[in-house]
Swiss-Prot record:
Function text: Catalyzes the hydrolysis of glutamine to glutamate and ammonia as part of the biosynthesis of pyridoxal 5'-phosphate. The resulting ammonia molecule is channeled to the active site of PdxS.
MF annotations from Gene Ontology: glutaminase activity; pyridoxal 5'-phosphate synthase (glutamine hydrolysing) activity
InterPro entries: Class_I_gatase-like, PdxT/SNO, PdxT/SNO_CS
Protein name in UniProt: Pyridoxal 5'-phosphate synthase subunit PdxT
Catalytic residues identified in the record: C77, H171, E173
Subunit (UniProt): In the presence of PdxS, forms a dodecamer of heterodimers. Only shows activity in the heterodimer.
Biological processes annotated in GO: glutamine catabolic process; pyridoxal phosphate biosynthetic process; pyridoxine metabolic process
Pathway: Cofactor biosynthesis; pyridoxal 5'-phosphate biosynthesis
Organism: Protochlamydia amoebophila (strain UWE25)
Lineage of producing organism: Bacteria, Pseudomonadati, Chlamydiota, Chlamydiia, Parachlamydiales
Amino acid sequence: MLIGILALQGDFFKHQEMLHSLGIETIQVKTRNELDFCDALIIPGGESTVMMRQLETTNLKELLVHFAIHKPVFGTCAGLILMSSHVQNSAMMPLGLLHIAVERNAFGRQVDSFQVDVSVYLKPGDEICFPAFFIRAPRIRTSETPVQILASYEGEPILVRQGHHLGASFHPELTVNPSIHLYFLEMVKENLENHKK
């Protein structure tokens, strides 16, 4: 299993550290050649408008959409914004991998960053207490079927899954708790097994 981490901008190295601690091989993705080797992709936090502009100028945007048809993608914070179907109050045209509408920086600016324990339900009836770090985090304003809500904060979704894609408005890579990354790895394994059949 080889997990790609989009490395155009943002905190991609923290995802690498988390996956390496779990014994998972990773590759920084900046070109099509690197993407072609990957079984899945993580889109990290960072500056969503800068990341989208770089995706467009490197011709990676359409390649990512095609990649995501058959392979899992996990986006955190800015990565969630890029994976959404609509960004409120923005001209950005996101990837459309998750049937959600988001609002950038809606949890506050950099000075308003905070950490809070949230209940995460990665399996039915199995509650995990997870330390969620919100840094200029987006809010998920609307979600549509078949989006599954795996965690909420103050009544709003903050961790969602749609098919073989996962998105978080917070930063699980900044904790020492690997639960959400392990969940994504299980999604990747399941996807690999399904494509062997």
